[in-house]
Amino acid sequence: MSSLEQLSQLTNDLYAKVHAPLDSNHDLREKQMENIEQLLKERALVMEMGLERPKDQKSKQIVREILMKSQAIQEKLAEMSGMIHQEINQFKQKKQMNRKYDLPYDGPTVEGVFFDKRE
C-alpha cells in the first residue's frame, strides 16, 4: 500500500470517527476521544514520512478527497473542542454554585472596609 493510499485510509477512518455522535457516558466519550487522538497520531506519522507527488488522475483525485475530508475533520474537531470547553465551564459554574450553598458565609466581608463617599 502506498503512503498516499495509507493516508487516504487513515483520513477516511478519522472522518468516520469524528462524525460519529459522541456518547453521553463520560467513560465511553473519553474512549472515543482516545481513538480519534490515536488516528491523528498515525496520520501525522504517515505525513511526516513523506508522500510521493501525485502523477496520474487517480492519485490527484485521492489528494482532493483527502484535502476535503481534512477540512471537514478540522471543522468538526474545532466544534468538539468548543463543546468540551463549554462543558468544562458549566462544570466550573456548577461547582462554584454548590460551594456557595455549602459555605454561604465564606465570601469576603465588608467589615473594616473604608468606603469613600467622595468621588
Curated annotation (Swiss-Prot):
It is found in: Cytoplasm, Cytosol. One of its GO terms (cellular component) is cytosol. The keyword S-adenosyl-L-methionine does not apply. The keyword Cell membrane does not apply. Keywords: Bacterial flagellum biogenesis, Chaperone, Cytoplasm. One of its GO terms (biological process) is bacterial-type flagellum organization. Belongs to the bacillales FliT family. Homodimer. May act as an export chaperone for the filament capping protein FliD. This is Flagellar protein FliT. It comes from Halalkalibacterium halodurans (strain ATCC BAA-125 / DSM 18197 / FERM 7344 / JCM 9153 / C-125) (Bacillus halodurans). The gene is fliT.
